C-alpha cells in the first residue's frame, strides 16, 4: 500500500458514514439479560478532584495534520478541567505493518505510548500481540472503567471482539459491512427512466442503457478483484481477500476453499470479460481496463457508475460538494439480497499498551468522549467556527480548508467514532444514514470466522507466490487478456504450487479457532 492509497483509504474510512445523530436512531437495550460483562454501577460520574493529573499518548495511523495542536488545546482545556487528564497524539504515516513495527519499537524504548489504533490488517493476530505483551486484557476493565460506553454495544458486538474469551480492543461504534453495491449517478437513472437495480443483471441493463443513450459517458468502473466483486452474490464469505480464500455462509462445517475451486469462478470471470467486450469500461487507446477511483474521476462526470461498498457514496457525494458540484450525486444499489459480512468492531478500535500504567485512565477518557455530543464534537470536529461551520442540519469545513486537512481526514477520529453522535456533512444526509443503518442491521451479520487471523508462517512460501499469482490473474481479466483456457491453467498452476496444502493449514487453524470460541 503506497502513501497515496493510505490517504484515499483514510478519507474513505473517516468520511464513510459522516452523519447521523441519536435523534433518528432507535436506541435499544443492547446488553439485556444476565451477562458477565454487565457493570453494576448505574451512571458513571467523574470527580476530577480525586484524580491524579495524567497525560496520555495515543498512536494513530495517518499523516500529521497542522490543526492537531489547535484541536488538542481545545480538547485538553475541557478534559483537564473535568477529568484532570491531558492527551497527546502521535501520527505515523506508514503502511500498517510498519506502523505496528514503530509502535513496538517505541514501547521497547520506553517512549510514552498508552494506547494505539488497532487494525485487523496487522500482519500478526491479536492473540500474538497479547502473548508478546503489547496489548492489555480489557475484559474486566472495559465495563468497569467505561461503563456508559460499554452499554452501547450489543452482546453480539462484544462476542465478536473476544479472542479466546478475552477482550483486547475498545471498538468504535460505527457499523460497517462489505456489502457490494452499484454506485450510480442518480440523475442518469431518472433521465433515462432506468428500473431499480437489484442484482448484476439489472446493473448490466443500466450499463447498456447508458452506452446507448449517452455514448460520451463511460458506463462503469470498478477497482476490485473477482472475489471482492462476486463472493457476496453467490453466498460466500471472504476469509482472505488477497489470497482468495472463501467459505459458504450456510456451511455448518465452515469448509474453506480457494476461490478458483468454487463452481462459480469461471462464470464470474466470463461476466467481467463481457463488460469489456460490451464496451462498458474505460478505453485508453486500444486498451480497455479499470482505474483506481480518485477525486478527479468522481468530479469529472465522465463515469456513470462504480462498483463499490455500501457507504462509499457518502464519500463520493462529500467530494462533489467540496468542489461545488450539485448537478449530480451518487446513489447505491445493492447487488444481492443475501447477507454480507459485517466488519468486526475491532477494526479501527483502540488497543491499550499492556505496559502502560494508565489503562483505567485511557478508558476513563473514552467514556468521557462518548458521554455527550459536546465532548464528541470538540474532539471529532474541533472548534465551531474555526474548524467547522454549522449549517441548518449539517456541518462543513470553513471556506478555503482543503479536504486533506479538514475534519474529514483527521487520523485521530476513526477509533472513537459513534453513530449516535456523528454529524451530517451534507443536506439531507441524516435520512440516508438511517437507511444505511437499516440495511446494515437487516442485511449483514458477523461471519462464523469473525476475528480469525490465519498464521501463514508454515506455508509462507506458498502464500507469497499465491498472492502474486492471484493479483496477476485478476489483472489479466480486467485488461481483457483472458479466456477459459487461461482459467484452467491458473487452477492447475495453483494446485501444483500447493494451494491445497495452504488451505488445509488454514482449515486446521480455523477449526481450532471455532472450538476455542
Which residue stretches match the model-derived regions?
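Extracytoplasmic/secretory soluble proteins
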Residues: 2-517
